[in-house]
Amino acid sequence: MNLDDYAGLDALALADLVRKGEVSAAELEETARRAIDAVNGTINAVVGDVPAAEGREETSADAVFHGVPFLLKDLAHGYPGVPCEMGSRLGAGYINEAESVYGARCKASGLVAVGRTNTPEFGLSGSTEPVANGPTLNPWDLGASAGGSSGGAAAAVSAGIVPIAHASDAGGSIRIPSSI
């Protein structure tokens, strides 16, 4: 699938293409990885890969997001075997061992994790500029912040890397990036 067509479709439309057999889940995953390669060097939204063997789960073709690529916020995502470094040099190398309810539900919905998004250290800032990974830039204005703490997720979706990404909010972590 070409990147422009891919970036113009939302998660439900991509899942519908998979259900109709017009594109395979593997093709969508490969397209998402190409989108990361094409865009991420400019905005720094994605800070780590999720290998295909870890990100892809066998789900029913009837799952609402069957085959749709998405990105995990690098903060308490609950995917076993996947690094979760929490935007911090202190978290470098930490690997989740247990699966969270969130992780299980994402997998059951058919989402395919292809990477991890940038977040401020421990999610404690309204701007995604961790020392560990560097700043995430707003894809609409490269001179501006992407906000935070879900700035990597917001920038990745806005730039067309994936149609859907894990984000969380306790004090504006989704609302701040969406308002910028």
Language model segments and positions:
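Gly/Ser-rich catalytic/binding loops embedded in alpha/beta enzyme cores
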Residues: N2-A170
